[in-house]
Amino acid sequence: MISPSLLILYVENPAASGRFYEQLFGRAPVAQSPGFVAFRFESGLGLGLWSTGSPEFVSSGTGHRSEIAIVVDDDAAIDALHETWKAAGVAIEQPPFTAVFGRTFVALDPDGHRIRVCPPDK
């Protein structure tokens, strides 16, 4: 069986994006180079930030077509994280609201990738 273990976001400045996610996640990257920064989580999932300026990066796509979802326990945790990120200067695209799947909000990273905070699937 195939099991995804790494998500990659293509970013203009991996070092700046790495600092952003380090603050957001409260953890240091596990790997860094001029064109790539990587984080690893207890679940085994990894997040890679790869430079769009890298000679290995080839894409005919345009725009931001990705969203990271961070699942938290309940509505209070969603609202608390929103306030923490807002106070830290994180760009908020959608303030907390109740969608069909529950309370949620969406923040943006420095490259405009969406970061959704939401409850677990039920």
Show which residues each predicted segment covers:
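Conserved active-site tyrosine of GNAT-family acetyltransferases
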Residues: 17-22, 85, 112
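Short alpha-helical
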Residues: 15-16, 76
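Vicinal oxygen chelate
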Residues: 1-5, 27-75, 79-108, 119-122
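Conserved beta-strand-loop-alpha-helix junction that forms the acyl-donor binding cleft
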Residues: 11-13
